[in-house]
Amino acid sequence: MPQHICELTYDLIQRGVLTFDKSANDDKVVTFHDSCNVARASRMGDSPGGQFEIPRAIIRACVNRFHDMAPETIQESTFCCGGGGGLLTDDLVELRVKGALPRMQALQQVVEEHGVNYMAAICAICKSQFTKVLPYYKHPMDMIGSVHGLVSNAIVLGAKQ
């Protein structure tokens, strides 16, 4: 049965196959963006809500500092990145910037409260969108990254025999 890469990674973590050095990500204070297509139209794992819990569990396995955005802005109540639905074109950048406003406001809150400097996502559209719009909101474009980028930074190769 096909599975999302997060499901495979989570399974390997649960079985102790992957080992991490969380300190490899100590330069990052991380939050997570629930991509709207994944949040509303996907399922991960064996139980409802896996699409929310699995990416966060992977992040927590790889970083020492993780902070969710406000509860009313995540999971089933997540905000669209503003770039989906065919909007991911430079011709529509003004609309994309406006569409990202609710997420940018939620992000700004955790930046101010917790010093967040990295927003992880699992959707390629979201990552492309945020790379473009983050500078409009006075954040560096490299503030957005992938969950598996964190995995890659922290993985300890050759730890298991």
Language-model-detected regions and their locations in the chain:
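Iron-sulfur cluster-binding electron-transfer modules in prokaryotic oxidoreductases
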Residues: M1-Q161
